[in-house]
Amino acid sequence: MHPDLGPLWKLLYVLVILCSSVSSDLATYFISEPLSAVQKLGRPVVLHCSAKPVTARISWLHNGKRLDRNTEQIKIHRGTLTILSLNPSLSGCYQCVANNSVGAVVSGPATVSADALADFDSSTMHVITAEKKNTGFIGCRVPESNPKAEVRYKIRGKWLMYSTGNYIILPSGNLQILNVSSKDKGSYKCAAYNPVTSELKVEPAGRKLLVSRPSSDGFHILHPALSQALAVLPHSPVTLECVVSGVPASQVYWLKDGQDCLSGSNWRRLYSHLATASIDPADSGNYSCVVGNNSSGDVKHVTYTVNVLEHASISKGLHDQKVSLGATVRFTCEVHGNPAPNRTWFHNAQPIRPSSRHLTEGSVLKITGVIMEDSGLYQCMADNGIGFMQSTGRLQIEQDSGQRPVIVTAPANVEVTDGDFVTLSCNATGEPVPVIHWYGRHGLITSHPSQVLRSKSRKSHLFRPGDLDPEPVYLIMSQAGSSSLSIQAVTREHAGKYTCEAVNKHGSTQSEAFLTVVPFETNTKAEPVTPSEASQNDERDPRDGSESGLLNLFPVKVHSGGVELPAEKNASVPDAPNILSPPQTHMPDTYTLVWRTGRDGGMPINAYFVKYRKLDDGSGAVGSWHTVRVPGSESELHLTELEPSSLYEVLMVARSAVGEGQPAMLTFRTSKEKMASSKNTQASFPPVGIPKRPVTSEASNSNFGVVLTDSSRHSGVPEAPDRPTISMASETSVYVTWIPRANGGSPITAFKVEYKRMKSSDWLVAAEDIPPSKLSVEVRSLEPGSIYKFRVIVINHYGESFRSSASRPYQVAGFPNRFSNRPITGPHIAYTEAVSDTQIMLKWTYIPSSNNNTPIQGFYIYYRPTDSDNDSDYKRDVVEGSKQWHTIGHLQPETSYDIKMQCFNEGGESEFSNVMICETKVKRVPGASEYPMKELSTPPSSSGNGGNVGPATSPARSSDMLYLIVGCVLGVMVLILLVFIALCLWKSRQQSAIQKYDPPGYLYQGSEINGQMVEYTTLSGTARINGSVHGGFLSKGSLSNGCSHLHHKGPNGVNGILNGTINGGLYSAHTSSLTRTCVEFEHPHHLVNGGAVYTAVPQMDPLECINCRNCRNNNRCFTKTNSPLPVVPVVASYPQDGLEMKPLGVMKFPVCPVSTVPDGGQIPEECLKDSVAPAPTQRTCRQDNTSDINSDSTEDTAEFNRGDSSGHSEAEDKVFSWSPLILSPVLEDCSEKTAWSPPGPPLDGLSVVLQQAQET
């Protein structure tokens, strides 16, 4: 039977309660704190933190701000913080906070950073010479790396990982070669290896080592060339390097502060170097490497200044204290370190800021008038950059009866006119009765009891010479639980926030009120001082024995005579001038500042002071101020020597005898610099007095983010500020920064920021009532993955300004929902192009549906030289998920690269894409022309989501346009060539048809005379020429139509080769018309021996040859429309090789150029006479003008006899074919017909036959 365990369980329960109550009363302390980490982007990071007692709750801080458990990409579970995917926004300082009912403590900072390995400096290959059997030195400038890179060397294609043999890799990364030999010559390349990312980068150029014969040049210190200063951590290994050539290592000596440093120390010799395994702070000092012989005086040395750093430490820390309410507490924290550490105080894990009750004096924190809220845990943290230390102390406060203050009547917001009197009241209750304090924008407001109210005059404070910024005068009247703050003669400087704080030993409470000061619109006279006010003015505190206190509080303008002028007594400082100049100038280096005078305050304006400086709206940097003094009578100032396309800020104030007024502010932008060859004309200025209200649409605004307001409108409303710039504050918040412009003559009272989410048409207020001193505001609670635009509004007493131009779209990092699935399919690289000798541009496509529409966060672009076979040589660029193209920079000229991609999100990376190979361009020669490349831009995704990436819509490149132009030109040329070929073919076919149906002449097959043939052909024009033919077919004139027939006569010895010259026939330039005469060659012996005449005959016009159809020579006429008569080429259409022209006997063939003949067919008798005189009564064959050609024939004959060289050269190369033909001349008007002998008579009897024919 089991015993009853009821009482035992009750006892155990009571013990647990007691233990928990005891543990809850224990102060919290850390068992383990987070450690710094270096990790690759996109990889997870885990931080651990644990504290005692076990009831302590753990929370985390990032860069001093508390992390929410629902923060994207961060997972918090008890004392473990996990960064799921490291990105730049998550890098920084992390601290854990442990708290319980006693208080809270904060851990030391742990830095989380992304790995980094910079590139080697691009340099040319250096040639190094080392002497044989001596020491060689290869220098290496190791690039920056996080963490520190490991140095390796590639020697003649082989890797050297560690010091081996005669190769020593020094801690500085340099390489020392001992006992150099011929086999050591070759190429040496230094490499840096990042142990976190396993990334290896090799020096691009390297060194080339040449080995020479030993020489007697003496000894040299190769490294270091100059004295060095080292700062090292304590207890770390240190090597002081000294590479010497020309002497053995035994002749190298090391001295510390002039004494031998090897005896009795931890230092040892390592070849010619000095090394220690653990250095101590006592080892700090000057170390010298001495080489040479002191006796001979030939000594060389180099010095190291070693500074051993010390971690921060606390020699005297905090201890627990227990005090009563209202007491004063002091915590002491003495720190040491090298360099001197910074000391930071914390109360319950919150930094302590100095106040009236919390004061820091050296190593002491002093708290006066402690209250219950001051109880808890206090920490002193010392940090000097190489280490931190902390000490914790607990403050307990004894409780007694009482009540914390409660404000029952809070001060109200007040709006008053400039110069009026205002009073703010505040009442509070508590036990004990609380004390009430007032705070303004300058801190705690104090008031001496002697201060009294002044008259309610509407004027500003008058300044004495030398008083630049007098403190505003206030009057505080307080009693138990009640207080009032009075301000007389309110000015614009008094506007702002006022805080009422009620404090007793149990705590404090606060209430706020805003004071708004509006300008006084009308001129008023000085109000008289009433007797009561005068009596108040004469009141003095007995403790104040002089009037100096009042004079300091109410300074006045003191003149040389010592009497204040009445006009000055009622005058005030002038108002801000109204700037009329536009915010943009058409000139690149000058600007005309034009203004209008504001109210002068009752005194004339003596001068204007204009200050201007350049602003860099891209980086926020500003230039130095330039100040110009302008006489008060002027209203215009020309600013010169400005920079083109730059933004400038102008501040302008008016000064009178009373003082300087409120400043007017303006920002303007200069225009672009115009090139000398530009043909663009400058836009004309608009006519004065005809204002044009610009369109303030976001789409059409192109004024560099400036909204141009109407220059003729001077209602006092400020101008719209410049386009705001957006920068990331955290994952879900941004900083909106802007630059204000002219204030419209009235001070700016507030700013307002609006935002709009893309795909939404509503503008919402992000922040309002922003003080005018702030030009930046943080907008929180933005939705991850969304795209926003922002704009700014300026407010003064006259109202709101125009809205500024909307900012450029800003996409918040992350996604609305978490996606744990990583993408599988990567992007596809569609195009690569080398845009310069160091840049390659690539485009890609990504189809979300290939990964089930899983959104992606961005792309990884990997690239390495093609000749590399090591995956660690790949470099990586990270690109946003909305991009569709990227330009890889910092590449080597004329080098081929392998390029591949991945897409990634929070779940991981996708598979690799296709690999593209692209080679950079040849390095441009200095001085060669270089054409700017058009900027490629990809419009943001319309969805605002990095995963929904559509096809690229970037504009066409200039190279594509060049290809298009060349293709069009070639196409037009090919088209013209095809048309030309078609025309040639058509022309050829036309000529073939013409030659087929309209031959140049028809040959009649006559009788053979002793085996010889006589050729006849028609002729358009002939002349009486001794042995030559004149008026050939190649003359410039048009050949006359007709039926004229020419009978050729050939002398003995004429063969088939034309050895003579045809003058005036084939190539004659004469133009002639032939007469209708009977022409006969009666002097055949004048022809050149061995020559022959051949003349082409044009066709006859159909109208002239109607009657030729009855001619008995069977010649035919064909119709030819509107074209010159064809000519027969010199060479016959059908040449026959070996054809010989037989000589004929002397014959006379009378020719009668007629169209018709009688039926009898007989030739008239006059046509057969030896005389060649034409018959005047003869009927002609055509109605042409007749002309005597005897003179022409004479000239041509003479020309022929001279032997024209040109005609001769043409004819010599021609072989003429003579077709056998005998033409029977038919004469229209001849009554007789010549009887021809039948073929068959011998050649010798030819003359007899012809003679008989003549006799008949």
From Swiss-Prot:
What species is this protein from? Rattus norvegicus
Q: Where is this region: Disordered?
A: 522-550, 671-696, 929-952, 1174-1212, 1231-1256
Its organism's taxonomic lineage begins at: Eukaryota, Metazoa, Chordata, Craniata, Vertebrata
Cellular localization per UniProt: Cell membrane
Query: What is this protein for, i.e. what is its function?
Result: Component of a cell-surface receptor complex that mediates cell-cell interactions between muscle precursor cells. Promotes differentiation of myogenic cells.
Q: Quote the protein name from its UniProt record.
A: Cell adhesion molecule-related/down-regulated by oncogenes
Query: Describe its PTM?
Result: N-glycosylated.
Which keywords has UniProt assigned to this entry?
A: Cell adhesion, Cell membrane, Disulfide bond, Glycoprotein, Immunoglobulin domain, Membrane, Repeat, Signal, Transmembrane, Transmembrane helix
What are the transmembrane regions? 964-984
Q: What is known about its induction?
A: Down-regulated in actively dividing cells. Not detectable in suspension cultures. Accumulates only in cells that are attached to a solid substrate (in vitro).
Matches recorded under InterPro entries? FN3_dom, FN3_sf, Ig-like_dom, Ig-like_dom_sf, Ig-like_fold, Ig_I-set, Ig_sub, Ig_sub2
Q: Where is the Fibronectin type-III domain?
A: 573-674, 720-815, 823-923
Q: Coiled-coil regions in this chain?
A: none
Q: Does the keyword Zinc feature in the UniProt annotation?
A: no
Q: Which GO terms describe its biological process?
A: anterior/posterior pattern specification; cell adhesion; cell fate specification; cell-cell adhesion; cerebral cortex development; embryonic body morphogenesis; embryonic morphogenesis; embryonic retina morphogenesis in camera-type eye
